[in-house]
Amino acid sequence: MKVIAVDKVVLAFSGGLDTSVCIKLLEEKYNMEVITACVDVGQPRDEIERPAMVAKELGNYRHYTVDARREFAEDYIFPAIKANAVYEGYPLSTALARPLIAKKIVEVAEKEGASAIAHGCTGKGNDQFRFEAVIRSTTDLDVIAPIRDLNLTRTEEMEYARSCGIPLPSDKLYSIDENLWGRAIEGDILEDPMVEPPEDAFEWTKPIHETPEDPEVIEIGFHGGVPVALNGEELEPVELIGLANEVAGKHGIGRVDIMEDRIIGMKSREIYETPAAFLLLEAHRGLEQLTLTRSELRFADIISSTYAELVYSGLWHDPLREDLDMAVNHMQRRVTGTVRVKLHRGSMRVIGRESPYSLYSEEIVSFEDKTLDQREMAGMVKNYALQAAIYSRVCRKEN
């Protein structure tokens, strides 16, 4: 394998086995000075503090911790809400975070004058595409993926870690990836698609038998398609998403168990918890139904699937995604108002919505109103199914 001749590299670092092994590999196999960086997109506090401690323990490496929570909410999650971006039933929590993490790692590398960026992705997952698509779209820095490039198995990683004195992780049942928008759960027992996920795999969502007996009604305020308030209280983006996670999660809302089609073509059983995403997306769609025209709603469905496919596939910087954002932002300018949602025992439904841009007219809909002259409908109805009528006549002639 050709070794890239570089002096300094910034490693996207979590402090786990993969990236800890990468530190030593980058030094020994690539002869580079390693700088580590962790990007905060809403992980638990211990997952933000651990990388700095591990980097120090492994060799006192220079380490960066970058707080990107607000940027993640405003520039990634909110555009996804406006586009109703969901991939195969999955609200894209991990997929949305990766381009931002890559962006911040690039910024650290440029600040340090590094020649390369490294990550700990394997050759079977989606993240290698998501990281490298952003890096190669925004910089000329080299990209190194030691685990993938050296074709290491998990067992080989652990053997190498032992030889280097790297502490091995405790035997955890699950591998977790968590951010503001969701929690992804993986583990050996979950790889069998016939095995129900054990209850101990979940943290954000309650099992149905532990949810409140009484339903809860919550009001969500939107401005231009973006959630801005809960129960009449305007909140900062990070706080609003966190509170929405708590409210929906305690009612058992937000669990996802799907067979997901990965970028490379393989199917994978994936488990997610995304309570805030379920709640906010449902409310957003409810408000769109009140404020967008029928043709806009139909086109929004097309945008939603295309947008989600681009994000999932790591193509955040594809020009089409930017084009779609422009169209979405124009359509969303009237998606302002309040939506009332009832949560109970793992279910939710929109039970009320209002907007200054409402296209609903109670007067016209009323059976007692004569604003719309019913007699004018006769001509429209007569020719409404014209093609179907012609087709039927043609078929009768054939018979």
Swiss-Prot record:
Pathway: Amino-acid biosynthesis; L-arginine biosynthesis; L-arginine from L-ornithine and carbamoyl phosphate: step 2/3. One of its GO terms (biological process) is L-arginine biosynthetic process. It catalyses: L-citrulline + L-aspartate + ATP = 2-(N(omega)-L-arginino)succinate + AMP + diphosphate + H(+). One of its GO terms (cellular component) is cytoplasm. It holds the Pfam family Arginosuc_synth. Keywords: Amino-acid biosynthesis, Arginine biosynthesis, ATP-binding, Cytoplasm, Ligase, Nucleotide-binding. It comes from the Archaea. The keyword Ligase applies. L-aspartate binds at residues 122, 126-127. GO terms for molecular function: argininosuccinate synthase activity; ATP binding. It is found in: Cytoplasm. ATP binds at residues 12-20, 120. L-citrulline binds at residues 90, 126, 130, 175, 260, 272. SUPFAM superfamilies: Adenine nucleotide alpha hydrolases-like (SSF52402), Argininosuccinate synthetase, C-terminal domain (SSF69864). It is an enzyme of class 6 (ligase). Its EC number is 6.3.4.5. Homotetramer. Belongs to the argininosuccinate synthase family. Type 1 subfamily. This is Argininosuccinate synthase. It comes from Methanothermobacter thermautotrophicus (strain ATCC 29096 / DSM 1053 / JCM 10044 / NBRC 100330 / Delta H).
